[in-house]
Every structure is written in structure tokens, then in C-alpha cells.
């Protein structure tokens, strides 16, 4: 990967980047990093700086079109070609569809789907113009099954998966690779922020290491792979299993894990 700018756009509950994932001889220039409206963006920038990286923190609401443009303007201000982009923004909402708020779900779609398309439009045109680049788009293992009690989240991740794979085919002739990362349940605050602590995905549940998942995604992006399931061997087996199981069976099984438990 040539020396240039790298972009990481993520919601604040997603995996934090680790500079150690970038080989020293290939480390890019400035890294505009957005983690939504959270003050964790400053912590992320400090972590990168301690490792000798030049990070430009950008606080922006990626569920809003103006927020996406703010991030892209930060990329343009570097004055350097964009070498790599990680589109990692996303969140879930737990609970029965009858009980969840419509505004919350429309906001989820804006973040998980609309912002990815919006930012990808800017990123892909820029990279195609320069004739090279690498893109990592985060989907989820949830893209491979119906997700009752996360009824809007799963379909949003199915979209990003197919979007990434479609883009990959289009951009081949322009020297740009697109990789889709599909993590299983990961040890971040993702499920807590989705209001799912009173489910099988809550506190104490066995989950994949976010450091391992981040490294797997980075390596796959650098190798130009089409997609990778992020997580341990059991997670990867689940992805294979999902290809053959009936959708109704997968839906029922997910419901037993994601359905809120009665308060005792």
C-alpha cells in the first residue's frame, strides 16, 4: 500500500483501531478517524499518537448527511491520496419490534446503511481516480440469518455485505479492492448499547476478542480478500452452517438468544 491517507469511520461502540495492525514500512500518513459524537474519538487519537501515528480526530454524527460530509472534508484537507478506508459504523437495537421506537430504527438505518453508501461514494470515486486503494466494510455474521429481537439490525448488515461484494466486482478494473468483514459477537459494548444486557448476548456471554477481529479484518483488507468471518473457529463454523440451515430455523434459534428475559 502506498504512503497516503487512511480513513476509519465508525460508531463509538465499534472496535477501536490498533496501530500495531499496520506494518511499520507501510504505515500511511494522516489518519482521519471518526467515532460519531462520542468523546472517545479523542482517546482513540491519543492511542494512535502514542504509537507514533498522525491522527486527525473528527467528531461527527455519521447518521446525518452533514456529518458524513464533515468526515470527507477532513480527508480532502490532508491533500494526500486516500490509501485505505475502513467503513465500520453501525449499531443495533434490541427488543421486540412492536416495542421499539420508529425514530430509533430509522436512525439505525441512516447509520448502518445510508452513511455507508454516502461515504463509499466519496471514497470510491477518489480511489478510482487515483487508480488504487483498499476498502474494508464491516457487516456482521447477522447478515447470514434473520435476527428477531434485532429485527432491523440484521437486514441492515445483509445490505452492507451485498453492497461490499457488489462494489468489489465493479472496482476491480480501477485497481481498488473491497473487503467485507463479518464479525460474530464481539467483546465490546455493542450489545449493552443496544439494550441487550438482559439477553443471552448480555454481560458474561462468551464473545470474540475485538483485537483478534480487528486484526483479521485488517489482514484480509491488505490481502485484498473478498470477505472474512471475524472471530474464533466456532464463529467461522457458524457461518458455514448458516449456508445450509432453513431461515425459519435460524430465526427461531436467534430469537431464543436475543429475546429479552423477564425481570425477576
Report the location of each language-model feature.
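Conserved NAD(P)H cofactor-binding loop of Rossmann-fold oxidoreductase domains
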Residues: 88-93
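SDR active-site lid
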Residues: 168-233, 237, 243
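Canonical Rossmann dinucleotide-binding motif of NAD(H)/NADP(H)-dependent dehydrogenases/reductases
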Residues: 1-32
Amino acid at each position: 500500500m502506498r504512503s497516503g491517507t487512511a480513513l476509519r469511520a465508525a460508531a463509538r461502540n465499534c472496535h477501536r483501531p490498533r496501530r500495531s495492525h499496520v506494518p511499520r514500512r507501510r504505515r500511511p500518513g494522516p489518519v482521519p478517524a471518526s467515532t460519531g459524537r462520542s468523546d472517545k474519538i479523542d482517546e482513540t487519537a491519543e492511542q494512535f499518537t502514542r504509537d507514533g501515528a498522525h491522527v486527525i480526530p473528527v467528531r461527527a454524527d455519521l447518521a446525518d448527511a452533514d456529518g458524513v460530509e464533515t468526515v470527507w472534508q477532513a480527508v480532502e484537507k490532508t491533500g494526500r491520496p486516500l490509501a485505505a478506508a475502513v467503513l465500520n459504523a453501525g449499531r443495533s437495537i434490541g427488543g421486540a419490534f412492536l416495542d421499539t421506537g420508529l425514530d430509533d430504527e430509522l436512525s439505525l438505518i441512516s447509520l448502518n446503511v445510508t452513511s455507508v453508501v454516502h461515504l463509499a461514494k466519496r471514497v470510491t470515486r477518489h480511489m478510482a481516480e487515483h487508480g488504487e486503494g483498499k476498502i474494508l466494510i464491516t457487516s456482521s455474521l447477522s447478515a447470514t440469518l434473520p435476527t428477531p429481537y434485532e429485527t432491523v439490525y440484521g437486514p441492515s448488515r445483509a445490505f452492507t455485505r451485498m453492497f461490499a461484494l457488489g462494489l468489489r466486482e465493479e472496482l476491480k478494473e480501477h485497481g481498488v479492492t473491497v473487503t467485507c468483514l463479518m464479525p460474530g459477537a464481539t467483546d465490546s459494548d455493542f450489545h449493552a448499547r443496544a439494550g441487550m444486557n438482559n439477553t443471552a448476548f448480555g454481560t458474561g456471554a462468551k464473545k470474540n476478542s475485538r483485537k483478534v477481529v480487528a486484526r483479521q479484518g485488517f489482514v484480509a483488507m491488505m490481502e485484498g480478500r473478498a470477505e472474512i468471518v471475524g472471530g474464533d473457529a466456532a464463529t467461522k463454523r457458524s457461518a458455514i452452517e448458516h449456508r445450509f440451515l432453513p431461515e425459519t430455523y435460524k430465526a427461531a434459534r436467534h430469537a431464543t438468544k436475543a429475546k429479552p428475559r423477564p425481570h425477576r
